[in-house]
Each structure stands twice: as C-alpha cells, then as structure tokens.
Amino acid sequence: MSRKQAAKSRPGSGSRKAEAERKRDERAARRALAKERRNRPESGGGGGCEEEFVSFANQLQALGLKLREVPGDGNCLFRALGDQLEGHSRNHLKHRQETVDYMIKQREDFEPFVEDDIPFEKHVASLAKPGTFAGNDAIVAFARNHQLNVVIHQLNAPLWQIRGTEKSSVRELHIAYRYGEHYDSVRRINDNSEAPAHLQTDFQMLHQDESNKREKIKTKGMDSEDDLRDEVEDAVQKVCNATGCSDFNLIVQNLEAENYNIESAIIAVLRMNQGKRNNAEENLEPSGRVLKQCGPLWEEGGSGARIFGNQGLNEGRTENNKAQASPSEENKANKNQLAKVTNKQRREQQWMEKKKRQEERHRHKALESRGSHRDNNRSEAEANTQVTLVKTFAALNI
C-alpha cells in the first residue's frame, strides 16, 4: 500500500482535509478582500469610496442593518448570497454551479437577455468559471432556483426586489450593490454570527402608508368643505337662538363683518333690532306727543279739564311720563338681555371647547392603545419566527 493510500485510509483524514481546504479558502478570501480594497478607484481625487461606504453604512443603520463585506474576487455575488442563505460564504462555488445549471435547464427564459454577439453556450460556460463577475441574470436564476426573493440595497435608491416565486411570505435574501461592481451581504446591526440571515422587508407597511396618504389627500378637501359648512350653520343657529332673529342673510352678513365672532355678531344683530324698534316707535307717535300737540285743551283751566276734571289731565301726564320713561327702561332691559345672552353664549362655548378637548384626549388614548397592541402583536410574531422586519421608504419589484 502506498503512502497516499495509507493516508487516505486513516480515520479522520477526510475531516482534516476539509478543514485545511476551508482555511485555505478563508486566507484566499482575506487576501482578495485586501487587494480589492487597495485597487478600488478613488473618484474625485481620493476618498470617494470611503465616503460612499460611510454613506451606505449610515443609510443601512437607519434601517437597523449593516454591511457584512465579502471579498471582491469576482465571486462576491455568490459569496453574499451564500452568507444570507447559509450564514457563511464558503460554498460560493457550489452556488455558482447550481445557478449555471438552472440557467441551462431554463434556457428559453435566459437566452433572450444574453448579449447579441455572445452565444448562450459561451456565456454560461464563462459564468461557470470561478472569479467571473455575475449580473442580474444570475440573481434571477438563483432566486427562482431556491424559490425565494432577493432584495438589493443601493445607496440613495429604492430597494430592488427580485421575485423568484409568486408565493407570498417567502424567504428574502438581502444583499448590497456598491461601487457599480461589487456585492456585499446585509445583516442586522448586531448580527455577528454565522447563522443564516432572516430579514423580511415590510412591504405591507409601505403599501399601507401610501394608501393612507392617498386617502388623506382625497378626503382632505371634502372634509374641510364639510367642516366649514357645519361651522357656519352652527354659528348662524347660535346667533338666531340668542337674538330671535330669523333673517338668515342678515345673520350671515353680521358674522362675516365680525370675522365669525359669535358674540360680536349677536351684539350687532341686537343693535340692529333695537334700531328697528326705535324707528317703529317714532312712527307710531306716542300719546304724550299727541297730548302736547293738543296744546291748551288739556291744560289746567282748559276745556278738557273743565269737562273731565283734573283726572284726565293726570292720566295724560302719567301716560306721557310712561312714554318718556319707556325708552330708558327698554334700553336697560336690552342691556340685561344682552348680558344674559353673552354669558349664556360664553358658557355654551366653554362647554363645547371642553367637550372637544375630552373627545381629543379620548381619540389620542384610543390611537395609542391601538398602536401599542399592534406593536405587541408584531414583536410576538418576530419572536416566534425569528425574522427581522426591514422598514423601507420605496421599493421596485422585478
């Protein structure tokens, strides 16, 4: 038996060989990553890539995520997808070959997207070689082969979701596309493990927010018009109840003149009514004025006094005094009525404001309790499935 055969027959030799290959692959990955960092082009005279990396990291941090870098050795796409799928990138060659095999089986789906001057056989043969850069066709093939969705993060751009199946609630793999040529894996901000990533984009929240915004924009105009009409009708009714005036146009004119101040409108309407009553009283000619116009007839010693006695004279004077006193007494009564109306209106307005504040507090409490209940349900669902929801501001589906 030769030495090689003896070495192969020893127990544990296979595991040691696999361990050695794994370490060799890791060293090659570290060297490729260092070389890729040194050879990255610096746009704008230097520091451009570092600035892009910092901006990208801040963008992901706002979503509770971070970059897990993989070497830029031409295998970065399959390394990033493998890290998401398995928790490490050591099986990138296997993922590459499986993707190429799927593209060959589904040739009619992928051949139209190959460049015209390159035959399909040559394209897939080149893609099967380690270190060959893979593009969108490989991502689509990988997603369909594994029946999952791939979400691509880019700097200052919406998320791209490549759907590998039409099923809902399927697994998602999140990768980052940087520098126009490199892919990295995306992880939770505190995830340093070698476990598979479980990230799920909250597209439902995004669509719900968009529909809510459209509904608010649609109903805002109608609600504002209805509210304004209700407020005007309510103000007119209050002025009508306080003054007894049934002239709708007159009340509206006074409300507009007083800038819809209900108390000022009530005072204005009462003054106008008082002026109308004064004019009517002047046109009726009070009895005192008639007595005065009769002149000597009712004076002492006149014909009326001799015929009816001084009683008629006293009655005429009394009636005249009543007529003279009535305007001042009526003014006092109107002032008292105005004070009562104003106080009543003020109390009613205070009661309405208090009721409105109570309704506002009740609505806030209901919204808070509903939001806390929804957050509790979501936290329970995350704890059961161990999936991290990724918020997003915009998304594009492929």
Curated annotation (Swiss-Prot):
One of its GO terms (biological process) is negative regulation of phosphatidylinositol 3-kinase/protein kinase B signal transduction. It is found in: Cytoplasm; Nucleus. The keyword Phosphoprotein applies. One of its GO terms (molecular function) is cysteine-type deubiquitinase activity. It catalyses: Thiol-dependent hydrolysis of ester, thioester, amide, peptide and isopeptide bonds formed by the C-terminal Gly of ubiquitin (a 76-residue protein attached to proteins as an intracellular targeting signal). Its EC number is 3.4.19.12. Residues 65-189 form the OTU domain. Glucose and fatty acids stimulate CREBBP-dependent acetylation, promoting its nuclear translocation. Residues 16-41, 345-381 have a biased composition (Basic and acidic residues). Residues 127-137 are annotated as: Variable-loop. The modification Phosphoserine is found at residue 224. Residues 70-76 are annotated as: Cys-loop. It holds the Pfam family OTU. Keywords: Acetylation, Cytoplasm, Hydrolase, Nucleus, Phosphoprotein, Protease, Thiol protease, Ubl conjugation pathway. It comes from the Eukaryota. Residues 177-182 are annotated as: His-loop. Residues 230-270 form the UBA-like domain. Changing residue 288 to D: Found in a family with an early age of onset of diabetes; uncertain significance; reduced the stability and catalytic activity. GO terms for cellular component: cytoplasm; cytosol; nucleus. Residues 1-50, 305-383 are annotated as: Disordered. The active site is at 73, 76 (nucleophile), 182. Residues 321-342 have a biased composition (Polar residues). Transmembrane segments: none annotated. Deubiquitinating enzyme that hydrolyzes 'Lys-6'- and 'Lys-11'-linked polyubiquitin. Also hydrolyzes heterotypic (mixed and branched) and homotypic chains. Important regulator of energy metabolism. Glucose and fatty acids trigger its nuclear translocation by CBP-dependent acetylation. In the nucleus, deubiquitinates and stabilizes the nuclear receptor PPARD regulating the expression of various genes involved in glucose and lipid metabolism and oxidative phosphorylation. The UBA-like domain has no influence on ubiquitin hydrolysis. Specificity is given by the S1' ubiquitin-binding site within the OTU domain composed of the Cys-, His- and Variable-loops. This is OTU domain-containing protein 3. The gene is OTUD3.
